[in-house]
């Protein structure tokens, strides 16, 4: 089945689209990537999303218009990714997260993604699955991470323990025990958000460059600096890093306000811009490793990286150094595009919903049971 996956992550760097040919349903899942591309948001839409993610208030009427505008741009991405390719039969669209509240005591998680599925279905003429996270939160889960079931199907190894480490705006992991140890799908699998990924680094670059630079290309700016280990240790004492999984987070915790805290913490050290950025990059790498050492049943035999962080060579180098001697590869090296992996994942989740198959892993999200993820919109 030809399916389009669409997502814009917490970095808000554009709409990632993937057109894939899918077959199989579980460990027999086969994925062929036919096309992948990132389509930048129009600047007015991107600016509004970033303002909203910073916690700035906007009138309800503007929120409604933004919801529709995001859907229009997602629909356009779905139309463009099909050019010169086989026609798609289905769309799985994550939308744009603008708010995520994890489970807090007896208060359930809440998550809000914009980009109406009905509009995407109408504009493309394709059945569209959206709003994937709500069924999991309604079952008592965090609503995140949702990619773990895909990771099980695509990256499980007969003998090796693997960690699939996504570094998007927020970093998250899936721990996969050897298949020889798994009696049924999901048993022994763990996953959670480890903490900040690219979005905090992007915010820092935008602040330090006075808005002239959106992100640290290949990590070259941070690579010119030296991490302040005292600051890294201070930041690693944040309660989130000590919280046992299942857990999830977002810009609400590691966003603009957190960056301002980090800048204040750094003042006594008189760091250069390069040193500050190197220190923040070290926080992302060190927090990932801390999560492994604190909460995994055993360290992995291999780490597979995916997401935009794969393009940050300095971050990848620091993570590999901190994990020595564990090999750190990208999913490119085992046959799946690291850049397109999240878009591929939501194509698969949409496909499973269309087939009436569950998409969450309760051991990862904390949900009480497996559930069908997403809402189906058809047109006409």
Swiss-Prot record:
It is an enzyme of class 2 (transferase). Signal peptide: none annotated. Pathway: Amino-sugar metabolism; 1,6-anhydro-N-acetylmuramate degradation; Cell wall biogenesis; peptidoglycan recycling. It catalyses: 1,6-anhydro-N-acetyl-beta-muramate + ATP + H2O = N-acetyl-D-muramate 6-phosphate + ADP + H(+). Keywords: ATP-binding, Carbohydrate metabolism, Kinase, Nucleotide-binding, Transferase. ATP binds at residues 9-16. It comes from the Bacteria. Pfam families: AnmK (PF03702). Disulfide bonds: none annotated. CDD domains: ASKHA_NBD_ANMK. Its EC number is 2.7.1.170. The keyword Transferase applies. InterPro entries: Anhydro_N_Ac-Mur_kinase (IPR005338), ATPase_NBD (IPR043129). Catalyzes the specific phosphorylation of 1,6-anhydro-N-acetylmuramic acid (anhMurNAc) with the simultaneous cleavage of the 1,6-anhydro ring, generating MurNAc-6-P. Is required for the utilization of anhMurNAc either imported from the medium or derived from its own cell wall murein, and thus plays a role in cell wall recycling. HAMAP family: AnhMurNAc_kinase. This is Anhydro-N-acetylmuramic acid kinase. It comes from Cyanothece sp. (strain PCC 7425 / ATCC 29141). The gene is anmK.
């Amino acid at each position: 089945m030809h399916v389009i996956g669409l997502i814009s992550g917490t970095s808000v760097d554009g709409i990632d689209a993937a057109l894939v040919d899918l077959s199989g349903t579980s460990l027999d899942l086969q994925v062929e990537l036919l096309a992948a591309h990132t389509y930048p948001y129009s600047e007015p839409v991107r600016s509004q999303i970033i303002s909203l993610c910073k916690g700035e208030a906007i009138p309800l009427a503007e929120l409604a218009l933004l919801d529709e505008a995001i859907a229009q741009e997602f629909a356009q991405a779905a139309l463009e990714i099909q050019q010169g390719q086989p026609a798609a039969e289905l769309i799985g669209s994550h939308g744009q997260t603008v708010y995520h509240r994890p489970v807090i005591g007896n208060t359930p998680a809440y998550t809000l993604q914009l980009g109406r599925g009905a509009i995407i279905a109408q504009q493309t003429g394709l059945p569209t699955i959206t709003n994937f996270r709500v069924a999991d939160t309604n079952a008592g889960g965090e609503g995140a991470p949702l990619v773990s079931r895909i990771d099980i199907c695509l990256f499980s190894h007969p003998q090796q323990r693997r960690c699939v480490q996504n570094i998007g705006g927020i970093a998250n992991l899936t721990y996969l025990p050897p298949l020889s140890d798994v009696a049924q799908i999901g048993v022994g699998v763990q996953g959670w958000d480890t903490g900040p990924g690219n979005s905090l680094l992007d915010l820092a670059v935008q602040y330090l460059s006075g808005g002239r630079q959106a992100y640290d290309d290949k990590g070259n700016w941070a690579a010119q600096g030296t991490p302040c280990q005292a600051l890294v240790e201070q930041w690693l004492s944040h309660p989130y890093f000590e919280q046992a999984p299942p857990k999830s987070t977002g810009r609400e915790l590691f966003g603009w306000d957190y960056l301002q805290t980090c800048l204040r913490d750094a003042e006594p050290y008189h760091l250069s811009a390069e040193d500050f950025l190197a220190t923040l990059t070290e926080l992302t790498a060190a927090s990932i490793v801390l999560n492994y050492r604190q909460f995994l049943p055993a360290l992995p035999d291999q780490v597979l990286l995916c997401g935009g962080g794969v393009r940050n060579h300095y971050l990848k180098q620091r993570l590999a150094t901190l994990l020595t001697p564990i090999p750190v590869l990208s999913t490119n090296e085992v046959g799946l595009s690291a850049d397109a992996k999240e878009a591929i994942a939501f194509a698969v989740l949409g496909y499973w919903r269309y087939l009436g198959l569950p998409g969450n892993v309760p051991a990862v999200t904390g949900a009480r049971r497996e559930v069908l993820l997403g809402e189906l919109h058809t047109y006409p």
